[in-house]
């Protein structure tokens, strides 16, 4: 008797939602408490089954538990190489055989970036420094994205964030960047001085990404005009 979850997702994602973990665990219910006689991995073409076997806590000879299975699924995703994972349970006289069906992330081919105006795509590619023609690792991407956000911060764009990361089946890594656009200025507390007299001194412009360095310079220019104490 075999029990396997529904068809795996067709489009890669760079995380494992809690709901997806729950769905992956559901078929285990009839086998909880039974002895695990064998663990195997299928679907891996580049990565090694031994890497998965090394991180799972449920071993042959142990009882299958819901908590242990959930922990193991999380650990396998935590390796960063897979965008989908489904456990299969096969009933045998001695207990149950457990097979992990994995789908590896695509091989990285090219980078596309949307929303970037202050750091060019070519410069972002250098900052990320991801190896091409190799299977993408989610953990590596997340670390490199933090490096990109740190570079934005260094340049003064402290509100800039990578809002979304997508790995497309053709090997394209797509980054959606939100640089923290200034939508408007509001001036409060000025009784005698008109708003435009203050805002014209601002180096920051509406529709441009917020820059902390420009904001400080703008405030200094306003104070230097002697409008305020």
Regions found by a protein language model. Name each.
Residues 2-229:
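Periplasmic polypeptide-binding modules associated with outer-membrane biogenesis and secretion
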């Amino acid at each position: 008797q075999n029990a396997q979850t529904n068809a795996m997702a067709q489009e890669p994602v760079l995380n494992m939602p809690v709901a997806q973990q729950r769905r992956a665990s559901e078929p285990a219910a009839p086998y909880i408490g039974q002895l695990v006689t064998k663990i195997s991995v299928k679907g891996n073409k580049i990565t090694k089954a031994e890497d998965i076997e090394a991180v799972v806590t449920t071993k042959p000879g142990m009882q299958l538990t819901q908590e242990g299975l959930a922990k193991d699924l999380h650990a396998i995703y935590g390796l960063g190489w897979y965008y989908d994972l489904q456990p299969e349970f096969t009933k045998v006289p001695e207990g149950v055989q457990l097979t992990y069906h994995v789908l590896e992330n695509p091989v990285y081919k090219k980078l596309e970036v949307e929303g970037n105006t202050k750091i060019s795509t070519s410069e972002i590619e250098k900052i990320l420094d991801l190896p091409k023609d190799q299977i993408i690792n989610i953990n590596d991407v997340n670390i490199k994205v933090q490096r990109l956000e740190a570079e934005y911060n260094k340049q003064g764009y402290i509100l800039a964030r990578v809002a979304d990361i997508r790995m497309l089946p053709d090997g394209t890594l797509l980054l959606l960047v939100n640089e923290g656009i200034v939508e408007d200025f509001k001036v409060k507390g000025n009784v005698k001085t008109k708003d435009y007299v203050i805002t014209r001194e601002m180096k920051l412009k509406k529709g441009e990404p917020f820059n902390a360095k420009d904001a400080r310079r703008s405030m200094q220019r306003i104070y230097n005009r002697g409008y305020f104490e």
